[in-house]
């Protein structure tokens, strides 16, 4: 196959689309594709060589995309590599416009998508250009200032692009990336997220084994140990998981994951966020940063297999632990994740198995033998996931996930999964009361259908279920239950498609050597006929009940309801599938039955009639000759008989019988055209008779008949979709149909029977057109010319005939021709349309009716608009005709899209992902070939725009602005489609649309005005004319939109018009992307283009450009860039002109300002006239305008920023660093090292003089130096090399002068500050980053020039305690501090002399409304700044924050502000943190709750830096351990006492010092706040320290949930809940357990009770870490069993609950010793009861014996409750043991009753199944127990 192809083509294609080979005109395709490819290579190469990015390069890259869509990668490897390299160069052009970049990127992704086609030897791509692109866009420094507008989709496109290029990065890339990004790894900083994001995206993982040393081995140990040591799920952990999953999947067998497997599974389990225990608090970040399931499944499936089998053990453990969550009765927000896990995991394993066993080997490294999945591995996997999947079938989220999982599992092990599904399906088919069970089981059966029917050696008995399933499914065709009906149709269709319905029962006698199974199947196949007939009866019943009630309104009559149309579709497609698969004998019987049904009664034509007609159509389509013989003569004679009566033709309401026969006829002719030729005379007779009926319904049906006849004759389509080539045959001696059950189609043996129009058919089509279409066209023409007056109804009838004639025959009519419209654009590269051959050779000698219709319709439209504009129905019809004249060649785009979607759905529901290689069923493959034909038919992009299109589009525009909104709306939709089809026609149409908006014109109606605006707005999918991304276009549309505000047709009273302008503004702002002013192409691109022009096979056509042309190209490139600049400046000038017009309404002023703000860019400064306008607008009286102006001026200031010189320094040359680098080991570590100590804040070495300041080496970015130093550190050059500070006005440029003059003007500033200190939205205002940017820019660009004017304002505002003035001054101050980054020392010193008093004052005036703003102010001021530059600020903030002055609230606020500043500084201020801690420690006993909470939060930040990460030095910041020691010493009074701690402190300051105990309780409250806040924030929990506080917490935490408890108790409870969820390392487990062990001996039963709840959560959230430590499991078990015998009843009961939970998640197992232990306990003898005296007290204290007996009973009931959904082998006996205790004393009796009632509740659903597990005697006892009187007692 391949060889022939390459000889014909002249090269061997990389990978073409095979379906093209099966088209009926395949012989013409090679020449066609070669010609197109040669054009693409030639023109794309030339476009790059001539430097014409637009339109040349863009146009021809789009052509390449289309080429790939039509032919696949049908080019040789050399071309493939050249295309990739060229596009890579294009994508990475530095100044390229984003929309073009995306367009190239998408094509490059397509070219790289099949990575097996190009190996690393063929292609190498550099990584750095992509990194620079990603960095420029994702971390843009100018986007937030509005200097760059990126589309929202760009991030996703870049990600996929990098993914596609990753396999081809050079081998040195990994090391280079690590050097680049490792210095960013500072875990407290946002740069950590950046580094991890880059690692995840860029690190290559597909290097061959010999290069692993240059690949993952460089980073794996570092990153995995980092991952292992992080405990609290920071946001970047997700990136690591994704990276590890990819690494594992790409290198199966080359990495030893075993040491990490328990940790991996523990974290996966934690990440599911399942609820455990009753009082669990979830940490919110666990939800937001949870792992993405799609990575988790890749990781798991890559870990399976291999020698150790450990992953499978853990996976089984995982599913055992979570199975019960899948039970349908459980529901919560975690369910979606669980379902996704179930659905994706089998798919992922199938994918892996396909790669191991079936995929053609590629250059990618194969999996080593040792790690391939063995048969046993697969079985184990399926066994482990089977139970949850079966439970999930009935889940609340629907059965879809389970069905997909089962489909994949059935491919692996049909014998394990299909039987249990069948067990659930058969009863579901019988039940009447639970229809949802039927829907669920059927959808799962559909998934496993192919595995079931194919049988195979694993599951030979599969096919036997086929017939019973089909027969039992029939009752599902139920008119009363819509969803049941639909799923039944789907089920029947799926199964029948796989099986030829042939009765082979006689083969048993006539053939020898059949196996037992084959014999059974043969005899069963006798049922097929019965099945088909029963199905037909069911359908009849369905139709009878759905006959249309006559009560519907006339309008609704037109359409069936949505549900009805779905049922109709389901019915007709299922019926046609069944008939297609029938043998001729069965078909004949069904045909007679349908024919009788259809012809013996008369149906109304709307619902029932349509369904019956559909069934008849299906029968005729299957075997046209046999069926037409019956139907056609019958219908024709019936119609002729009734219509013989002349009066009938003019009746308004037609005879029902006539209508029904006409409807039936119009459907049954939808068959192969050649079959219809036999009946041509009858058909013509009927058409002539009925096309001119008076009744609209009548002639519509006649038109439909005509349309169907023409289509059948003129289109290319497959004749049959049977599952076996050559149709269904009877069995013979050599052939047995049974063997074809479930057989996939063979791609190279499809034998598609095509219908291709014969000469005879074409003749007949044109005969019909001449006979029927021509007279109508003449009639309409006469009407237009005024020679013959026709009524509106007749016009409509004529149009209807014209339209249907055209729709039916359009594929034979050549497209419209005409002269191309000249001068829309001028490029040097040719742009021509691609002609795609679709099997039709147009006969040019015949009349081209497409042209004729066009010539008649245009004058008719004109006539109608002038004389009868209200004839809406005719206009509708004309719009449809114009649409089809332009585009229609036999298939509609939307129908094609729907078919493509449904094809994909069916493919997914029935595909075999394990074997791959297109093993679909035959019908599906034929469908795909047909879709390929239609795709070619619809390929329209890049058509030349000709004069005839221009005329029609102008007509559409006229209709789009007509008087009636319905007409406008329809015409606009057609117009938008047309605009997207023809090259550059928008440029032609925009001026025409804008004429309607011209303010000079007085003749434009409001409707026209609105229509024109809608034309500019566009629809949601198509083009938006108002915002085409070209300077020439927006230079026209934007000013016109603004000026239209002065048009007489514009009225702001009309809400619809106001809304339109809002929508337009909104759409433009949403969609605008910065348009480039630089269209240059670099040399590197041109070199590759020249190579491409020299390549061969096929030779590029046209060839390379001459030198002359190249020079011309360069000249044009320069000119184009110049033009762009001019157009940009002109547009800004035009918009400003509009604004200076006094008459412009306010709405339009705002619109214009919005447009102007989009004109800010980072590569060109804004023209000074616009700068002046924006600066003046800062004091505009409209808030909206002021806000836009603030943003704009901030952006302008960024444009005017003079670049500060930076020098690259090797970090090790910095004087401070040199001295500290003695030991070499240190440099490998991160954290506080000698070589980064000089960066830290040290009050003894602060730059307090000019000299110190100049000598100090400032490093502003906080993360530098924490991890490794970068190779080259960029530092600011010394002051004398920087731009001059304090420029005089003369030294400034014009833009700077404008700003300088305004901000030096006292009045301007007064007004500006007054506006800023107003309230915008009451109570909703926040600190505004925009205003901060504005002030930062002012002080950065102009130093302290404006301070003198602002100073009095700041002093006034600080003194005003109202919210808005405070916020305003906070914004100014933060901008001032950040703006002073490069000021000279003297200026900075003066600044702080001014600021410190202001800030002191502000902090003493702080209020509840403003403290957050001040926090933001200080945090913003300190972000990314060297702390040594801000020492004045820190020293000022550290002056006794908690003084009590101004009350507790002010204290809390001051702390908050201080925390904001210190948190930004992270690890660089250890000294300040120590000072703060020292200062706070004595104050931890604060009385006020708000101060306590704040101190708790501050402590979290103080200790944030104390992390336990790998390769990290111990921190010099405060450490938790030392702090905990000191705190514990102060809590002594509480830890020593035994009694429970009550909070008896009244919150008020009592004089004098209270006793130690009271102080300790206050301290404890603050410590609790600290523990709570740090739970979710820090990276690692300090477990050993927390453990020492545990005993105390257990003492306080209450047992019951009660809101009336005080704060301390609830806090303790929260802390315990949060701590129990913490991630534990394996070495911490013994510590925790010994702590718990100790507390369990405490005298307080509250503590003992709480231990159990703590234990439940802790074990579940660290399940696999515990399980991998056998001693720990024993200890936990012993602890629980001991507490089961606790003297306190509540503790015993809790221990039982805990035990049952542990058993349920398989942490503990029910073994012999445990069962024996409980049984012996439960048999403890109780002392005999003596006759008690009434009221004696002795008996209330439980004796030790009673406790032991109760413990035994509790243990037994725990066992029973641990398996709520099934009955294990040990359960019946335990139930019997329990029942013996029903009459024991309390509390035993209660326990037994409760257990029995729970058992009954949980096992009730599937009792039929569960009953099997008990013996008859046991059942008797049980039934007795469960319904005996004691149950009600």
From Swiss-Prot:
GO biological-process terms attached to the record: DNA damage response; DNA repair; proteasomal ubiquitin-independent protein catabolic process; sperm DNA condensation
| Pfam families tied to this protein | HEAT_PSME4 (PF23096), HEAT_PSME4_mid (PF16507), PSME4_C (PF11919)
Question: Which residues does the annotated region (Disordered) include?
Answer: 1095-1122
The UniProt entry annotates HEAT repeats at 460-504, 983-1022, 1164-1202, 1344-1382, 1626-1664, 1670-1708
Q: Does the keyword Calcium apply?
A: no
- Answer whether the UniProt record assigns the keyword Flavoprotein to this protein: no
State the UniProt keywords alphabetically: Cytoplasm, DNA damage, DNA repair, Nucleus, Proteasome, Repeat
Report quaternary structure and partners. Answer: Homodimer. Interacts with the 20S and 26S proteasomes.
Entry's family note: Belongs to the BLM10 family.
Name this protein carries in UniProt: Proteasome activator complex subunit 4A
Protein source organism: Danio rerio
Q: Lineage of the native species?
A: Eukaryota, Metazoa, Chordata, Craniata, Vertebrata
């Amino acid at each position: 196959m391949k060889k022939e192809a390459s000889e014909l083509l002249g090269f061997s294609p990389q990978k073409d689309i095979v379906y093209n080979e099966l088209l009926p005109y395949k012989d013409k395709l090679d020449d066609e594709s070669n010609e197109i490819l040669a054009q693409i290579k030639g023109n794309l190469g030339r476009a790059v060589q001539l430097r014409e990015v637009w339109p040349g390069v863009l146009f021809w890259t789009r052509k390449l995309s289309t080429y790939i869509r039509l032919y696949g990668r049908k080019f040789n490897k050399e071309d493939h590599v050249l295309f990739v390299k060229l596009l890579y160069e294009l994508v990475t052009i530095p100044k390229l416009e984003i929309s073009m970049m995306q367009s190239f990127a998408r094509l490059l992704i397509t070219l790289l998508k099949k990575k097996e086609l190009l190996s690393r030897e063929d292609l190498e791509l550099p990584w750095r250009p992509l990194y620079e692109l990603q960095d420029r866009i994702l971390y843009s420094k100018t986007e937030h200032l509005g200097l760059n507008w990126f589309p929202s989709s760009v991030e996703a496109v870049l990600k996929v692009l990098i993914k596609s290029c990753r396999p081809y990065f050079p081998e040195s890339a990994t090391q280079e990336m690590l050097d680049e990004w490792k210095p960013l790894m500072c875990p407290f900083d946002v740069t950590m997220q950046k580094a991890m994001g880059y690692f995840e995206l860029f690190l290559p993982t597909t290097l061959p084994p010999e290069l692993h040393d240059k690949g993952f081995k460089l980073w794996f140990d570092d990153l995995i140990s980092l991952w292992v040591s992080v405990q609290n799920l920071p946001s970047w952990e997700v990136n690591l998981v994704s990276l590890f999953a990819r690494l594992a999947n790409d290198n199966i067998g080359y990495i030893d994951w075993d040491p990490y497997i328990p940790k991996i599974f523990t974290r996966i389990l934690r990440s599911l966020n399942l609820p455990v225990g009753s009082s669990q608090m979830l940490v919110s970040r666990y939800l937001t940063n949870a792992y993405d399931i799609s990575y988790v499944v890749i990781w798991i499936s890559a870990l399976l297999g291999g020698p150790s089998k450990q992953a499978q053990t853990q996976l089984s453990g995982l599913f055992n632990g979570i199975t019960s969550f899948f039970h349908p009765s459980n529901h919560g927000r975690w369910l979606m994740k669980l379902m996704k896990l179930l659905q994706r995991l089998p798919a992922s394993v199938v994918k892996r198995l396909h790669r191991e066993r079936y995929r053609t080997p590629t250059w990618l490294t194969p999996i080593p033998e040792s790690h391939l999945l063995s048969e046993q591995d697969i079985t184990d996997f399926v066994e482990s996931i089977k139970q949850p999947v079966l439970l999930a079938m009935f889940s609340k989220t629907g059965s879809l996930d389970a069905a997909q999982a089962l489909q994949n599992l059935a491919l692996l092990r049909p014998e394990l999964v299909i039987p249990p599904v069948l067990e659930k399906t058969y009863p579901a088919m019988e039940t009447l009361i639970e229809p949802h069970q039927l829907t669920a089981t059927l959808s799962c059966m559909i998934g496993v259908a192919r595995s079931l029917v194919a049988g195979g050696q694993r599951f030979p008995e599969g096919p036997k279920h086929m017939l019973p399933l089909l027969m039992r499914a029939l009752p599902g065709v139920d008119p009363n239950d819509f969803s049941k009906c639909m799923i039944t149709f789907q089920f029947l269709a799926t199964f029948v498609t796989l099986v030829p319905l042939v009765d082979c029962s006689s083969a048993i006698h006539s053939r020898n050597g059949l196996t037992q199974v084959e014999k059974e199947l043969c005899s069963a196949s006798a049922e097929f006929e019965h099945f088909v007939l029963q199905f037909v009866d069911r359908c009849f019943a369905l139709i009878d009940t759905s006959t249309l009630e006559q009560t519907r309104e006339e309008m609704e009559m037109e359409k069936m309801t949505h549900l009805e149309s779905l049922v109709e579709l389901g019915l007709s497609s299922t019926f046609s599938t069944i008939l297609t698969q029938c043998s001729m004998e069965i078909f004949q019987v069904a045909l007679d039955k349908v024919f009788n049904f259809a012809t013996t009664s008369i149906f109304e034509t709307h619902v029932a009639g349509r369904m019956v007609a559909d069934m008849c159509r299906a029968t005729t389509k299957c075997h046209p000759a046999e069926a037409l013989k019956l139907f056609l003569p019958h219908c024709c004679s019936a119609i002729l008989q009734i219509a013989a009566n002349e009066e009938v033709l003019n009746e308004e309401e037609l005879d029902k019988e006539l209508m029904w026969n006409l409807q039936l006829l119009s459907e049954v002719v939808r068959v192969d055209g050649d079959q219809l030729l036999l009946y041509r005379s009858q058909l013509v007779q009927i058409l002539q008779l009925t096309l001119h009926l008076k009744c609209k319904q009548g002639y519509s049906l006649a038109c439909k008949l005509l349309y169907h006849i023409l289509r059948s004759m003129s289109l290319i389509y497959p004749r049959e979709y049977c599952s076996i080539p050559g149709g269904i045959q009877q069995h013979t001696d050599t052939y047995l149909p049974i063997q074809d059950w479930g057989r996939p189609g063979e791609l190279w043996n499809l034998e598609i029977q095509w219908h291709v129009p014969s000469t005879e058919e074409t003749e007949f089509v044109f005969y019909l057109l001449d006979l029927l279409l021509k007279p109508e066209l003449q009639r309409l023409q006469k009407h237009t010319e005024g020679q013959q007056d026709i009524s509106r109804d007749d016009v409509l009838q004529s149009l209807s005939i014209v339209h249907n004639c055209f729709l039916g025959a359009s594929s034979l009519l050549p497209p419209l021709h005409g002269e191309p419209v000249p001068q829309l654009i001028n490029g040097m590269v040719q742009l021509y349309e691609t002609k795609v051959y679709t099997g039709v050779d147009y006969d040019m000698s015949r009349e081209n009716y497409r042209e004729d219709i066009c010539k008649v319709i245009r004058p008719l439209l004109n006539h109608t608009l002038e004389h009868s504009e209200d004839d809406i129905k005719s206009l509708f019809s004309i719009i449809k005709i114009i649409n089809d004249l332009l585009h229609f060649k036999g298939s509609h785009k939307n129908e094609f899209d729907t078919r493509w979607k449904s094809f994909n759905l069916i493919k997914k529901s029935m595909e075999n992902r394990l074997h791959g290689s297109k093993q679909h069923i035959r019908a599906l493959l034929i469908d795909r070939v047909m879709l390929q034909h239609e795709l070619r038919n619809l390929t329209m992009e890049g058509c030349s725009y000709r004069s005839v299109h221009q005329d029609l589009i102008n007509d559409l525009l006229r209709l789009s602005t007509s008087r009636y909104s319905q007409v406008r709306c329809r015409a606009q939709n057609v117009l938008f489609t047309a605009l997207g089809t023809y090259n550059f026609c928008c440029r032609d149409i925009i001026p025409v649309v804008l004429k309607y908006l011209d303010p000079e014109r007085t003749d434009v109606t409001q409707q026209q005005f609105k229509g024109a605006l809608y034309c500019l707005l566009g629809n949601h999918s198509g083009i938006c004319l108002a915002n085409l991304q070209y300077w020439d276009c927006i230079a026209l549309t934007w000013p016109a939109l603004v000026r239209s505000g002065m048009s007489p047709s514009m009225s702001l009273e009309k809400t619809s018009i106001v809304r339109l302008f809002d929508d337009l503004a909104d759409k433009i702002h949403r969609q605008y992307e910065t348009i480039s002013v630089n269209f240059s192409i670099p040399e590197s691109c041109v070199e590759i283009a020249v190579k491409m022009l020299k390549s061969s096979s096929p030779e590029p056509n046209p060839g390379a450009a001459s030198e002359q042309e190249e020079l011309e190209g360069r000249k044009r490139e320069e000119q184009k860039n110049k033009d762009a600049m001019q157009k940009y400046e002109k547009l800004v000038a035009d918009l400003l002109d509009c604004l200076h017009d006094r008459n412009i309404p306010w709405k339009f002023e705002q619109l214009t300002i919005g447009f102007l703000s989009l004109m800010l860019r980072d590569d060109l400064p804004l023209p000074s006239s616009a700068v002046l306008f924006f600066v003046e607008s800062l004091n505009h009286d409209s808030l909206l305008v002021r806000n836009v102006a603030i943003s704009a001026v901030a952006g302008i200031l960024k444009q005017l920023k003079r670049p500060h010189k930076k020098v690259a320094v090797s970090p090790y040359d910095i004087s401070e660093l040199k001295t500290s680098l003695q030991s070499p080991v240190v440099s490998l570590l991160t954290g506080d090292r000698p070589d980064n100590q000089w960066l830290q804040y040290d009050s003894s070495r602060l730059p307090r003089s000019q000299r110190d300041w100049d000598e100090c080496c400032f490093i502003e970015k906080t993360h530098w130096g924490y991890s490794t130093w970068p190779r080259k550190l960029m530092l600011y050059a010394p002051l004398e090399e920087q731009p001059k500070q304090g420029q005089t006005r003369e030294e400034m440029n014009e833009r700077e002068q404008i700003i300088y003059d305004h901000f030096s003007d006292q009045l301007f500033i007064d007004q500006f500050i007054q506006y800023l200190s107003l309230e915008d939205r009451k109570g909703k205002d926040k600190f505004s980053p925009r205003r901060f940017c504005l002030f930062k820019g002012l002080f950065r660009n102009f130093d302290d020039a404006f301070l003198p004017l602002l100073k009095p304002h700041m002093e006034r505002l600080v003194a005003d305690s109202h919210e808005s003035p405070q916020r305003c001054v906070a914004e100014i101050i933060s901008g001032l501090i950040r703006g002073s980054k490069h000021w000279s020392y003297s200026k900075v010193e003066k600044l702080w002399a001014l600021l410190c008093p202001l800030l002191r004052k502000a902090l003493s005036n702080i209020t509840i409304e403003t403290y957050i703003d001040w926090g933001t102010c200080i945090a913003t001021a300190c972000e990314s700044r060297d702390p040594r530059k801000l020492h004045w600020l820190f020293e000022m903030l550290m002056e006794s924050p908690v003084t009590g002055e101004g009350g507790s609230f002010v204290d809390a606020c001051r702390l908050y502000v201080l925390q904001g500043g210190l948190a930004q500084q992270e690890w660089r201020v250890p000294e300040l943190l120590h000072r703060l801690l020292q200062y706070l420690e004595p104050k931890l006993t604060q009385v006020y709750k708000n101060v306590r909470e704040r101190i708790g939060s501050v402590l979290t930040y103080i200790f944030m830096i104390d992390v336990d990460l790998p390769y990290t030095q111990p921190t010099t910041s405060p450490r938790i351990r030392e702090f905990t020691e000191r705190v514990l010493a102060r809590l002594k009074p509480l830890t020593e006492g035994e009694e429970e701690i009550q909070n008896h402190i009244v919150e008020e300051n009592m004089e004098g010092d209270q006793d130690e105990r009271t102080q300790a309780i206050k301290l404890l409250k603050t410590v609790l706040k600290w523990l709570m806040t740090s739970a979710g924030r820090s990276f690692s929990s300090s477990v050993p320290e927390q453990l020492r506080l545990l005993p105390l917490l257990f003492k306080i935490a209450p047992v019951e949930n009660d809101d009336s408890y005080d704060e301390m108790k609830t806090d303790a409870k929260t802390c315990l809940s949060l701590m129990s969820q913490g991630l534990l390392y394996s070495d911490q487990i013994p510590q925790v357990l010994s702590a718990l062990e100790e507390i369990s001996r405490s005298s307080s039963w509250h503590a003992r009770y709480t231990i159990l709840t703590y234990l439940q959560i802790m074990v579940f959230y660290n399940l696999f870490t515990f399980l991998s430590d056998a001693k720990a499991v024993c200890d936990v078990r012993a602890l629980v069993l001991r507490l089961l015998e606790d003297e306190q009843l509540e503790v015993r009961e809790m221990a039982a609950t805990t035990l049952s939970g542990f058993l349920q998640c398989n942490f503990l197992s029910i073994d012999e010793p445990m069962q024996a232990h409980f049984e012996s306990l439960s048999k403890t003898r109780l002392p005999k009861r003596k006759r008690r005296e009434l009221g004696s007290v002795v008996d209330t204290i439980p004796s030790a014996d009673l406790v032991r007996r109760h413990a035994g009973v509790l243990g037994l009931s725990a066992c029973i409750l641990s398996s709520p959904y099934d009955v294990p082998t040990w359960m019946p006996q335990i139930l019997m043991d329990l029942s013996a205790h029903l009459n024991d004393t309390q509390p035993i009796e209660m326990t037994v009753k409760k257990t029995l009632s729970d058992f009954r509740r949980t096992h009730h659903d599937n009792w039929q199944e569960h009953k099997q597990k008990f013996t008859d005697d046991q059942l008797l006892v049980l039934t007795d127990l469960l319904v005996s009187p004691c149950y009600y007692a």
